[in-house]
Amino acid sequence: MEEHGTVKGRRRHIFVWKALRPLARLICWIKFGFTSEVSRVRGPFLLVSNHVTNWDPILVACSFPEQAYFVTSEHLLRAGLGGKLVGWLQSPIPRQKSGSAATTVLTMMRYLRRGLNVCVFPEGNRTWDGVTAEFLPSIAKLARTSGAALVTYKLTGGYFASPRWAGNSIRRGKMHGATVRVYSPEELRAMSPQEINERIVSDLHEDAYERQRKNPVRFEGKALAEHMERLLFLCPRCGRMHTLQSRDDTVRCWKCGFSFRYLPTGFLSGEDIPFDNLRDWTRWQKGEIVRLCDEADDKPIFTDTDVRVDTVVSGSGTKLLGRGDMRLFRDRLELPGASLPAGDITGVSLMGPQDLYISAGDTHYVVRSGTVHCMVKYLTALSHLNGGVHYGE
Protein backbone atom coordinates (compact mmCIF):
# COMPACT_ATOMS: atom_id res chain seq x y z
CA MET A 1 0.00 0.00 0.00
CA GLU A 2 3.04 2.28 0.02
CA GLU A 3 4.37 4.41 -2.81
CA HIS A 4 6.87 7.26 -3.19
CA GLY A 5 7.87 7.17 0.49
CA THR A 6 4.33 7.58 1.77
CA VAL A 7 1.04 5.62 1.61
CA LYS A 8 -0.93 5.08 -1.57
CA GLY A 9 -4.12 7.14 -1.40
CA ARG A 10 -2.75 9.41 1.33
CA ARG A 11 -4.69 12.48 0.17
CA ARG A 12 -7.90 10.46 0.05
CA HIS A 13 -7.31 9.14 3.58
CA ILE A 14 -6.86 12.66 4.97
CA PHE A 15 -9.93 13.96 3.13
CA VAL A 16 -12.15 11.10 4.35
CA TRP A 17 -10.91 11.55 7.93
CA LYS A 18 -11.62 15.28 8.00
CA ALA A 19 -14.94 14.98 6.15
CA LEU A 20 -16.42 12.15 8.22
CA ARG A 21 -15.06 13.00 11.67
CA PRO A 22 -17.83 15.53 12.59
CA LEU A 23 -20.49 13.03 11.49
CA ALA A 24 -18.77 10.28 13.48
CA ARG A 25 -18.87 12.40 16.64
CA LEU A 26 -22.63 12.89 16.22
CA ILE A 27 -23.35 9.22 15.50
CA CYS A 28 -21.26 8.04 18.47
CA TRP A 29 -23.11 10.41 20.80
CA ILE A 30 -26.49 9.18 19.54
CA LYS A 31 -25.60 5.46 19.79
CA PHE A 32 -23.47 5.42 22.94
CA GLY A 33 -23.86 8.76 24.70
CA PHE A 34 -20.18 9.20 23.80
CA THR A 35 -18.32 12.43 24.50
CA SER A 36 -14.66 13.10 23.78
CA GLU A 37 -11.97 15.67 24.43
CA VAL A 38 -10.28 16.99 21.29
CA SER A 39 -6.49 16.58 21.28
CA ARG A 40 -4.29 19.25 19.68
CA VAL A 41 -1.18 17.09 19.57
CA ARG A 42 0.81 17.43 16.34
CA GLY A 43 2.25 14.43 14.55
CA PRO A 44 4.01 12.28 13.97
CA PHE A 45 2.68 10.36 16.96
CA LEU A 46 2.09 6.81 18.07
CA LEU A 47 -1.37 6.64 19.62
CA VAL A 48 -2.17 3.78 22.02
CA SER A 49 -5.59 3.12 23.54
CA ASN A 50 -7.41 0.50 25.56
CA HIS A 51 -9.85 -1.66 23.58
CA VAL A 52 -13.51 -2.05 24.64
CA THR A 53 -15.86 -2.01 21.59
CA ASN A 54 -15.86 -2.73 17.86
CA TRP A 55 -16.36 1.01 17.38
CA ASP A 56 -13.10 1.96 19.10
CA PRO A 57 -11.24 3.22 15.99
CA ILE A 58 -14.15 5.56 15.22
CA LEU A 59 -14.47 6.62 18.87
CA VAL A 60 -10.75 7.38 19.14
CA ALA A 61 -10.75 9.26 15.83
CA CYS A 62 -13.34 11.65 17.27
CA SER A 63 -10.60 13.17 19.45
CA PHE A 64 -7.93 13.68 16.79
CA PRO A 65 -8.14 16.22 13.96
CA GLU A 66 -4.96 14.72 12.43
CA GLN A 67 -5.46 11.52 10.45
CA ALA A 68 -3.87 8.31 11.78
CA TYR A 69 -3.42 4.79 10.40
CA PHE A 70 -4.97 2.12 12.61
CA VAL A 71 -3.56 -1.35 13.13
CA THR A 72 -6.36 -3.83 12.49
CA SER A 73 -6.88 -7.55 12.05
CA GLU A 74 -6.17 -8.89 8.59
CA HIS A 75 -9.44 -10.79 8.93
CA LEU A 76 -11.44 -7.55 8.83
CA LEU A 77 -9.77 -6.50 5.59
CA ARG A 78 -10.77 -9.84 4.04
CA ALA A 79 -14.42 -9.45 5.09
CA GLY A 80 -15.97 -8.98 1.67
CA LEU A 81 -17.03 -5.62 0.31
CA GLY A 82 -16.94 -3.97 3.74
CA GLY A 83 -13.30 -4.92 4.25
CA LYS A 84 -12.35 -3.63 0.82
CA LEU A 85 -14.17 -0.36 1.50
CA VAL A 86 -12.34 0.13 4.81
CA GLY A 87 -9.04 -0.57 3.04
CA TRP A 88 -9.81 1.98 0.34
CA LEU A 89 -11.02 4.67 2.76
CA GLN A 90 -8.20 4.46 5.32
CA SER A 91 -5.72 1.69 4.39
CA PRO A 92 -5.23 0.21 7.91
CA ILE A 93 -2.05 -1.65 8.83
CA PRO A 94 -2.95 -5.39 8.82
CA ARG A 95 -2.21 -7.71 11.72
CA GLN A 96 -2.49 -11.51 11.43
CA LYS A 97 -4.75 -12.95 14.13
CA SER A 98 -2.85 -15.35 16.44
CA GLY A 99 0.27 -14.91 14.29
CA SER A 100 3.54 -13.06 14.76
CA ALA A 101 3.41 -9.28 15.19
CA ALA A 102 6.95 -8.69 13.86
CA THR A 103 5.88 -7.64 10.35
CA THR A 104 3.22 -5.34 11.75
CA VAL A 105 5.70 -3.62 14.08
CA LEU A 106 8.13 -3.03 11.20
CA THR A 107 5.36 -1.47 9.11
CA MET A 108 4.38 0.78 12.01
CA MET A 109 8.00 1.88 12.38
CA ARG A 110 8.23 2.79 8.68
CA TYR A 111 5.05 4.85 8.86
CA LEU A 112 6.16 6.74 11.97
CA ARG A 113 9.62 7.51 10.59
CA ARG A 114 7.99 8.91 7.46
CA GLY A 115 6.04 11.38 9.57
CA LEU A 116 2.71 9.51 9.59
CA ASN A 117 0.55 8.92 12.65
CA VAL A 118 -0.22 5.37 13.79
CA CYS A 119 -2.85 4.14 16.25
CA VAL A 120 -2.76 0.72 17.89
CA PHE A 121 -4.74 -1.06 20.59
CA PRO A 122 -1.86 -2.92 22.29
CA GLU A 123 -4.16 -5.42 24.02
CA GLY A 124 -4.94 -6.72 20.54
CA ASN A 125 -8.45 -7.69 21.57
CA ARG A 126 -11.44 -6.30 23.41
CA THR A 127 -11.71 -6.89 27.14
CA TRP A 128 -13.96 -9.70 28.38
CA ASP A 129 -14.11 -8.70 32.05
CA GLY A 130 -13.87 -4.89 31.91
CA VAL A 131 -10.21 -4.79 32.96
CA THR A 132 -7.46 -3.67 30.58
CA ALA A 133 -5.53 -6.79 29.54
CA GLU A 134 -1.78 -7.33 29.47
CA PHE A 135 0.07 -6.73 26.22
CA LEU A 136 3.45 -7.43 24.67
CA PRO A 137 6.29 -5.01 25.62
CA SER A 138 7.29 -4.54 21.95
CA ILE A 139 5.08 -1.44 21.79
CA ALA A 140 7.38 0.33 24.28
CA LYS A 141 10.48 -0.44 22.19
CA LEU A 142 8.69 0.87 19.11
CA ALA A 143 7.70 4.07 20.90
CA ARG A 144 11.27 4.73 22.04
CA THR A 145 12.99 4.14 18.70
CA SER A 146 10.41 5.60 16.30
CA GLY A 147 11.31 9.25 16.90
CA ALA A 148 7.60 10.08 17.23
CA ALA A 149 5.62 11.31 20.21
CA LEU A 150 3.64 8.78 22.25
CA VAL A 151 0.00 9.56 23.03
CA THR A 152 -1.90 7.45 25.56
CA TYR A 153 -5.69 7.52 25.31
CA LYS A 154 -8.41 5.95 27.45
CA LEU A 155 -12.00 4.96 26.68
CA THR A 156 -14.39 4.55 29.61
CA GLY A 157 -17.93 3.14 29.75
CA GLY A 158 -17.55 1.00 26.65
CA TYR A 159 -17.51 -2.34 28.44
CA PHE A 160 -21.13 -1.89 29.53
CA ALA A 161 -22.23 -0.10 26.35
CA SER A 162 -21.15 -2.99 24.13
CA PRO A 163 -20.22 -6.19 26.03
CA ARG A 164 -18.09 -8.44 23.88
CA TRP A 165 -20.19 -11.51 24.61
CA ALA A 166 -23.34 -9.67 23.44
CA GLY A 167 -22.22 -9.40 19.82
CA ASN A 168 -23.63 -6.33 18.07
CA SER A 169 -25.94 -5.36 20.94
CA ILE A 170 -25.48 -1.73 22.03
CA ARG A 171 -26.75 -0.24 25.31
CA ARG A 172 -26.83 3.54 25.53
CA GLY A 173 -25.40 5.13 28.66
CA LYS A 174 -22.33 7.29 29.09
CA MET A 175 -19.02 6.77 27.30
CA HIS A 176 -16.04 9.07 27.28
CA GLY A 177 -12.69 9.27 25.54
CA ALA A 178 -9.72 11.47 26.39
CA THR A 179 -5.95 11.73 26.07
CA VAL A 180 -4.21 10.64 29.27
CA ARG A 181 -0.68 11.80 28.50
CA VAL A 182 1.56 12.95 25.64
CA TYR A 183 5.23 11.89 25.82
CA SER A 184 7.68 13.79 23.62
CA PRO A 185 10.43 11.94 21.71
CA GLU A 186 12.95 13.49 24.12
CA GLU A 187 11.09 12.11 27.14
CA LEU A 188 10.90 8.67 25.55
CA ARG A 189 14.63 8.58 24.80
CA ALA A 190 15.35 9.35 28.46
CA MET A 191 13.35 6.29 29.57
CA SER A 192 14.06 2.59 29.22
CA PRO A 193 11.58 0.38 27.31
CA GLN A 194 10.50 -1.09 30.65
CA GLU A 195 9.76 2.37 32.06
CA ILE A 196 7.78 3.29 28.94
CA ASN A 197 5.83 0.06 29.17
CA GLU A 198 5.01 0.76 32.81
CA ARG A 199 3.73 4.23 31.88
CA ILE A 200 1.53 2.80 29.12
CA VAL A 201 0.14 0.11 31.43
CA SER A 202 -0.66 2.72 34.09
CA ASP A 203 -2.19 5.20 31.63
CA LEU A 204 -4.41 2.63 29.90
CA HIS A 205 -5.51 0.71 32.98
CA GLU A 206 -9.26 0.61 33.40
CA ASP A 207 -11.44 -1.50 35.70
CA ALA A 208 -15.00 -0.98 34.50
CA TYR A 209 -16.64 -2.50 37.58
CA GLU A 210 -14.48 -0.51 39.99
CA ARG A 211 -15.51 2.69 38.20
CA GLN A 212 -19.15 1.58 38.10
CA ARG A 213 -19.27 0.93 41.86
CA LYS A 214 -18.06 4.47 42.54
CA ASN A 215 -20.28 6.20 39.98
CA PRO A 216 -23.11 3.92 38.77
CA VAL A 217 -24.42 4.58 35.25
CA ARG A 218 -27.36 2.79 33.64
CA PHE A 219 -26.86 1.34 30.16
CA GLU A 220 -30.30 0.81 28.67
CA GLY A 221 -31.06 -1.74 25.97
CA LYS A 222 -32.98 -4.87 25.05
CA ALA A 223 -32.24 -8.50 25.96
CA LEU A 224 -29.39 -7.41 28.22
CA ALA A 225 -28.19 -10.92 29.15
CA GLU A 226 -28.61 -12.73 25.83
CA HIS A 227 -25.58 -14.72 24.62
CA MET A 228 -23.76 -14.45 27.96
CA GLU A 229 -23.02 -18.16 27.43
CA ARG A 230 -20.19 -16.96 25.18
CA LEU A 231 -18.39 -15.90 28.36
CA LEU A 232 -19.84 -18.10 31.12
CA PHE A 233 -19.98 -21.86 30.66
CA LEU A 234 -19.72 -23.19 34.24
CA CYS A 235 -22.63 -23.15 36.67
CA PRO A 236 -21.26 -22.06 40.07
CA ARG A 237 -23.93 -24.04 41.93
CA CYS A 238 -23.86 -27.50 40.30
CA GLY A 239 -20.50 -27.18 38.53
CA ARG A 240 -21.77 -28.52 35.21
CA MET A 241 -20.46 -27.23 31.90
CA HIS A 242 -22.58 -25.69 29.12
CA THR A 243 -25.83 -25.74 31.11
CA LEU A 244 -26.33 -21.97 31.40
CA GLN A 245 -28.94 -20.49 29.06
CA SER A 246 -29.74 -16.81 28.57
CA ARG A 247 -33.01 -15.10 27.67
CA ASP A 248 -33.84 -11.40 27.86
CA ASP A 249 -32.06 -10.17 31.02
CA THR A 250 -31.90 -13.58 32.77
CA VAL A 251 -29.45 -16.50 32.77
CA ARG A 252 -30.58 -19.89 34.09
CA CYS A 253 -28.96 -23.31 34.57
CA TRP A 254 -31.29 -25.88 33.04
CA LYS A 255 -29.80 -28.63 35.24
CA CYS A 256 -30.08 -27.22 38.77
CA GLY A 257 -32.35 -24.18 38.33
CA PHE A 258 -29.78 -21.59 39.45
CA SER A 259 -30.58 -18.21 37.89
CA PHE A 260 -29.61 -14.54 37.98
CA ARG A 261 -30.40 -11.26 36.24
CA TYR A 262 -28.06 -8.90 34.40
CA LEU A 263 -28.96 -5.35 35.47
CA PRO A 264 -28.68 -2.15 33.39
CA THR A 265 -25.72 -1.19 35.61
CA GLY A 266 -23.85 -4.32 34.50
CA PHE A 267 -24.07 -5.96 37.92
CA LEU A 268 -25.69 -9.35 38.59
CA SER A 269 -28.62 -10.04 40.90
CA GLY A 270 -29.93 -13.39 42.10
CA GLU A 271 -30.55 -15.63 45.11
CA ASP A 272 -27.32 -17.04 46.58
CA ILE A 273 -25.33 -15.74 43.62
CA PRO A 274 -21.59 -16.02 44.45
CA PHE A 275 -20.55 -13.03 42.31
CA ASP A 276 -22.30 -9.74 41.64
CA ASN A 277 -20.16 -8.94 38.59
CA LEU A 278 -18.67 -10.65 35.55
CA ARG A 279 -15.10 -9.66 36.40
CA ASP A 280 -15.01 -11.79 39.55
CA TRP A 281 -17.00 -14.61 37.91
CA THR A 282 -14.54 -14.72 35.02
CA ARG A 283 -11.57 -14.89 37.38
CA TRP A 284 -13.17 -17.80 39.24
CA GLN A 285 -13.95 -19.54 35.96
CA LYS A 286 -10.34 -19.21 34.76
CA GLY A 287 -9.20 -20.94 37.94
CA GLU A 288 -11.69 -23.73 37.32
CA ILE A 289 -10.44 -24.15 33.74
CA VAL A 290 -6.89 -24.60 35.03
CA ARG A 291 -8.16 -27.17 37.55
CA LEU A 292 -10.03 -29.07 34.83
CA CYS A 293 -6.87 -29.17 32.72
CA ASP A 294 -4.74 -30.42 35.60
CA GLU A 295 -7.23 -33.10 36.62
CA ALA A 296 -7.97 -34.38 33.12
CA ASP A 297 -6.71 -37.85 32.18
CA ASP A 298 -7.28 -39.22 28.69
CA LYS A 299 -10.82 -37.85 28.37
CA PRO A 300 -11.72 -34.57 26.64
CA ILE A 301 -11.45 -31.46 28.81
CA PHE A 302 -14.00 -29.66 26.61
CA THR A 303 -16.20 -30.68 23.70
CA ASP A 304 -18.03 -28.25 21.43
CA THR A 305 -20.37 -29.45 18.70
CA ASP A 306 -21.46 -28.07 15.34
CA VAL A 307 -18.32 -26.14 14.41
CA ARG A 308 -16.82 -25.30 11.03
CA VAL A 309 -13.05 -25.19 10.60
CA ASP A 310 -11.29 -23.32 7.79
CA THR A 311 -7.63 -22.82 7.03
CA VAL A 312 -6.62 -19.21 6.47
CA VAL A 313 -5.10 -18.56 3.05
CA SER A 314 -3.31 -15.20 3.23
CA GLY A 315 -4.50 -12.76 0.64
CA SER A 316 -7.36 -14.93 -0.64
CA GLY A 317 -9.57 -15.71 2.35
CA THR A 318 -10.23 -19.14 3.84
CA LYS A 319 -10.66 -22.75 2.71
CA LEU A 320 -13.06 -25.22 4.33
CA LEU A 321 -11.30 -27.99 6.24
CA GLY A 322 -14.22 -29.74 7.92
CA ARG A 323 -17.40 -29.62 10.00
CA GLY A 324 -18.26 -31.45 13.21
CA ASP A 325 -17.09 -31.50 16.83
CA MET A 326 -13.95 -30.09 18.42
CA ARG A 327 -12.36 -31.61 21.51
CA LEU A 328 -9.53 -30.46 23.73
CA PHE A 329 -7.33 -33.04 25.44
CA ARG A 330 -4.29 -32.45 27.61
CA ASP A 331 -1.95 -33.30 24.75
CA ARG A 332 -3.90 -32.23 21.65
CA LEU A 333 -6.74 -30.25 20.11
CA GLU A 334 -8.93 -32.28 17.77
CA LEU A 335 -10.66 -30.30 15.03
CA PRO A 336 -12.81 -31.53 12.15
CA GLY A 337 -10.14 -32.37 9.59
CA ALA A 338 -7.07 -31.88 11.81
CA SER A 339 -5.50 -32.99 15.08
CA LEU A 340 -3.05 -30.49 16.56
CA PRO A 341 -0.55 -31.52 19.27
CA ALA A 342 -0.76 -28.98 22.09
CA GLY A 343 2.98 -28.37 21.85
CA ASP A 344 2.69 -27.42 18.16
CA ILE A 345 0.15 -24.66 18.77
CA THR A 346 1.96 -21.31 18.61
CA GLY A 347 -0.93 -18.85 18.77
CA VAL A 348 -4.56 -18.68 19.79
CA SER A 349 -6.93 -15.72 19.79
CA LEU A 350 -10.55 -14.68 19.31
CA MET A 351 -12.16 -12.45 16.72
CA GLY A 352 -15.40 -10.96 17.98
CA PRO A 353 -17.37 -12.99 20.51
CA GLN A 354 -16.56 -16.55 19.38
CA ASP A 355 -14.49 -16.96 16.19
CA LEU A 356 -11.44 -18.89 17.39
CA TYR A 357 -8.14 -18.42 15.52
CA ILE A 358 -5.40 -21.00 16.02
CA SER A 359 -1.86 -20.99 14.66
CA ALA A 360 0.35 -24.06 14.40
CA GLY A 361 3.57 -22.84 12.85
CA ASP A 362 2.76 -21.29 9.48
CA THR A 363 -0.72 -22.83 9.31
CA HIS A 364 -3.64 -20.80 10.61
CA TYR A 365 -7.10 -22.15 11.40
CA VAL A 366 -10.37 -20.40 12.19
CA VAL A 367 -13.17 -22.17 14.08
CA ARG A 368 -16.69 -20.77 13.65
CA SER A 369 -20.20 -21.87 14.53
CA GLY A 370 -23.76 -20.69 14.05
CA THR A 371 -24.45 -22.03 17.54
CA VAL A 372 -23.58 -19.97 20.62
CA HIS A 373 -20.39 -21.34 22.20
CA CYS A 374 -17.96 -20.24 24.90
CA MET A 375 -14.74 -20.27 22.89
CA VAL A 376 -12.80 -18.04 25.26
CA LYS A 377 -12.26 -21.05 27.53
CA TYR A 378 -9.91 -22.54 24.93
CA LEU A 379 -7.60 -19.53 25.25
CA THR A 380 -7.21 -20.02 28.98
CA ALA A 381 -6.81 -23.79 28.65
CA LEU A 382 -4.31 -23.77 25.78
CA SER A 383 -2.16 -21.08 27.38
CA HIS A 384 -2.04 -23.26 30.52
CA LEU A 385 -1.29 -26.49 28.68
CA ASN A 386 1.33 -24.85 26.46
CA GLY A 387 3.17 -21.98 28.14
CA GLY A 388 4.80 -21.00 24.85
CA VAL A 389 1.58 -20.22 23.03
CA HIS A 390 0.97 -16.61 21.99
CA TYR A 391 -2.28 -15.85 23.76
CA GLY A 392 -4.69 -13.11 22.74
CA GLU A 393 -8.28 -12.61 23.84
Give, region by region, the residue ranges found by the protein language model.
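Cys/His-rich short segments
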Residues: E220-I273
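Long, charge-rich boundary regions
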Residues: R261-A338
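Broad, structure-driven detector of short, well-ordered beta-strand segments within folded domains
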Residues: Y153-L155, T243-Q245, F260, G324-R330, ...
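Soluble catalytic domains of membrane acyltransferases
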Residues: E3, V7-W17, R21, L26-E198, ...
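Acidic, Ser/Thr- and proline-rich intrinsically disordered linker/docking segments
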Residues: G343-E393
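Phosphoinositide-dependent membrane-docking surfaces
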Residues: L47, D325-L356
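Short amphipathic C-terminal alpha-helix that caps PH/PH-like domains
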Residues: S192-A208, M375-G388
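Short, flexible loop/turn segments with low-complexity composition
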Residues: E210-G221, Y391-E393
